[in-house]
Amino acid sequence: MRLTNVLFKKVKSKRIMVVLESVVSGHQFNAFRDRLADKLEIIRFDPYIQQESLYRERKKIRSA
């Protein structure tokens, strides 16, 4: 094993994929955000209720 292999660190991605869930109906979709950013809260059209609704980040899925 070479010394250079030991010195390399695994690089983390700058963005992560998260699940956003509607507060009103429970509709979910995936979105990307920066790893260091705060949790997402956005207003977006909800197809279940046919109106705009608040979506909150529910959980992290994976690095991207």
Curated annotation (Swiss-Prot):
Source taxon at top rank: Eukaryota
GO biological processes: mitochondrial translation
InterPro entries the record matches: Mitoribosomal_protein_bL33, Ribosomal_bL33_sf, Ribosomal_zn-bd
Keyword Acetylation found: no
Entry's Gene Ontology cellular component terms: mitochondrial large ribosomal subunit; mitochondrion
UniProt keywords, alphabetically: Mitochondrion, Ribonucleoprotein, Ribosomal protein, Transit peptide
Gene Ontology molecular function, alphabetical: structural constituent of ribosome
Intracellular or extracellular location(s): Mitochondrion
Family the entry assigns: Belongs to the bacterial ribosomal protein bL33 family.
Complex and partners: Component of the mitochondrial ribosome large subunit (39S) which comprises a 16S rRNA and about 50 distinct proteins.
Protein name per the record: Large ribosomal subunit protein bL33m
Species for this entry: Drosophila melanogaster (Fruit fly)
